Amino acid sequence: MIGYYVHHHGLGHRNRATQIARELSVPVLGFSTLECPPDWPGEWVQLPPDTTDQPEDPTANGVLHWAPLGHPGHRERMGLLADRLRTDVDLMVTDTSAEVTLLARLMGVPTVVMAMRGDRTDRTHRAAYDAATALVAPWSAETAEPYWPEEWNRKTTFTGAISRFDAPVRDAAGVGRHPLQPATPASGTDVAEPPSGVVHRESVLVVWGRGGTVVGDADIAAARAATPGWRWTVRTPDAPSPDLWRELHEATVVVTHGGNNAVAELSAARVPAVVVAQPRPHDEQLATAAALDRAGICVGLEHWPSPADWPVLLERALTLGGQRWDVWRHGDGAHRAAAALETLLRGERP
């Protein structure tokens, strides 16, 4: 059995884990503070929260990221994980937690870390990445971090982007198919070609997530005012799109943050885009935006620009177009990740 730990910040980790889990042909057991997603294909253990406003030595003198002393929720969640690692789990995936990675490895269970962009060379990340049996990176080798240690690169499977709009490679009966064969869409998800009859207008679609942002309504209003002739539509978790796949294709340019899943959805739709990094630990979104801009895939920015910059940025996004998104994705990222996990489960190298 494969164990799969899912971090609770935002929903991106859970969405990605679900896409991968649905491609597995072996049992999978999820762990998270979050509730079980409706389409999770196996058992799910909901862990008690371990947050607190007044933690005592949560980093263990700088060795760990989060292990507060005397916290009953933290002790309970680690105990629940240890119980299943002892009895059921043969391979443990973490997306992502250095502490869970090290716990599994200390219990003699092979570990796989879902890698994240940004500077992960701090003491804690370095220990987790070094200790892991393998890493899975949801981006392409062509756009990989140039500063990663070679020992990480050697044990990394670069899957390309993993999007909920990717067609599943494993059909409902669990029978594998070649990635290029037609696929049956997941329930409630349109993974077809761009809708017929779509008329592209001078429009901007802003897609913003729930993971934390420094961009407010006033910033977007100022950008809108600075770009007459462009119609702006804003979608957030509080004002979701009724059909995001269609809206992505209807938009002339899409503006979004640098979160891994948001960018994966852009890549699936192959749309001209402006990706604006939001502050994240270890400069994760800065690294994503820089990689996109460096590869000439779309406009990647370090921060939300001034209103006067928006006309030029939108025109630059149109000039770049969406033709180079294939550098970022292969179209079967979840299947590639699942295949690597099953190979490791057999004791082989992917």
Question: Across the structure, where does each feature detected by a protein language model lie?
Answer:
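A short, glycine/small-residue-rich beta-strand->loop->alpha-helix junction that serves as a flexible
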Residues: 5-18, 214
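Conserved nucleotide-sugar phosphate-binding/catalytic loop shared by glycosyltransferases and other
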Residues: 7-8, 26-76
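Conserved nucleotide-sugar donor-binding subdomain of glycosyltransferases
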Residues: 61-91, 95-101
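Donor nucleotide-activated moiety binding/catalytic core segment of transferases
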Residues: 77-80, 233-268
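A conserved, positively charged/aromatic
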Residues: 113, 126-137, 248
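A nucleotide-sugar donor-handling region in carbohydrate enzymes
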Residues: 131-202, 207-212
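Catalytic binding pocket for nucleotide-activated donors in carbohydrate/polymer assembly enzymes
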Residues: 263, 267-311
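C-terminal amphipathic helix plus adjacent low-complexity
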Residues: 311-350
